[in-house]
Amino acid sequence: MAVTDPIGDLITRIRNAQMRRKDKTSTPGSRLRASVLEVLRSEGYIRGFTATDHGNGRTEFEIELKYFDGVPVIREIARVSKPGRRVYASVKNLPRVANGLGIAVVSTPQGVMADHEARDKNVGGEVLCTVF
């Protein structure tokens, strides 16, 4: 069955795995998912991820989740821009998550990046999700 919202699916898989205190979870691979996971890894919200090629052009990512004293590092992760309602923000209107303690993952013409990086590069885009 086709997934209509791949980022929403990725977020749900991460949230569900952390509620069950899993060390790892897997998700189908795509370039957009890889970019979002790379932002989460570089910001310290996940330990990392590995890509596995299953042939026929199908890849799968295995995500290593991160915990601190048994508590998930990601307290809250939420989808902002959805297939039915896209949310775009200029550089001036990029959201500040938890008063700067969290991040917003933004898809810009220069690639997928965290909100603070988009502000540094003076570029806006589609707000994919927020993480705290």
Swiss-Prot record:
Function per UniProt: One of the primary rRNA binding proteins, it binds directly to 16S rRNA central domain where it helps coordinate assembly of the platform of the 30S subunit.
GO molecular function, one term: structural constituent of ribosome
One annotated GO biological process: translation
Pfam families (alphabetical): Ribosomal_S8
NCBIfam families: PRK00136.1
Alphabetic keyword roster: Ribonucleoprotein, Ribosomal protein, RNA-binding, rRNA-binding
One GO CC annotation: ribosome
Organism: Xanthobacter autotrophicus (strain ATCC BAA-1158 / Py2)
Protein's name according to its UniProt entry: Small ribosomal subunit protein uS8
Protein family according to the UniProt entry: Belongs to the universal ribosomal protein uS8 family.
Subunit structure comment from the entry: Part of the 30S ribosomal subunit. Contacts proteins S5 and S12.
Gene3D superfamilies referenced in this protein's UniProt entry, alphabetically: 3.30.1370.30, 3.30.1490.10
